[in-house]
């Protein structure tokens, strides 16, 4: 994904330059929906996607997934349910040594981190909290 240009005493940083950032923060691009069985996520526009007050089983994260991910791009998905909800990831996601979660637990927050794997063209699960 493309990060927003940063301005400071050294001037602007463009997406094609090589620059070392020291004491700088890169703010994640965040989008959210209150509840959806097929969430709409455009990976060109978000780093973190939040489902809040999830009141439905998630039947597919793949159905409305759009964007052109880059090698090793990171996607963070947050699900906060109103109860235990089933999760179906779909064909755009894969497990690694970390399994894809298949359900939320009550109203607990579920954080799932993915890294785009260009070898398989899938979002590979890298961590679950």
Spans of features found by a protein language model:
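Register-specific beta-strand positions within repetitive beta-rich fiber domains
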Residues: 8-27
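Exposed extracellular interaction/assembly regions and N-terminal maturation sites
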Residues: 22-93, 108-109, 116-129
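Short proline/glycine- and polar residue-rich coil/turn motifs
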Residues: 102-107
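Tryptophan-centered short beta-strand motifs
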Residues: 1-5, 121-123
């Amino acid at each position: 994904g493309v990060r927003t240009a940063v301005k400071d005493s050294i001037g602007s940083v463009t997406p094609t330059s090589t620059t070392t950032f020291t004491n700088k923060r890169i703010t994640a691009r965040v989008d959210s929906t209150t509840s959806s069985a097929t969430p709409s996520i455009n990976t060109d526009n978000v780093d973190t996607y939040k489902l809040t007050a999830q009141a439905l089983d998630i039947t597919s994260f793949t159905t409305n997934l759009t964007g052109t991910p880059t090698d090793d791009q990171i996607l963070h998905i947050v699900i906060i349910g109103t109860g235990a909800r089933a999760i179906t990831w779909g064909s755009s996601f894969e497990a690694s040594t970390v399994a894809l979660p298949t359900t939320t637990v009550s109203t607990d927050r579920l954080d799932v981190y993915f890294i785009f794997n260009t070898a398989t063209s899938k979002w590979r699960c890298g961590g679950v909290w």
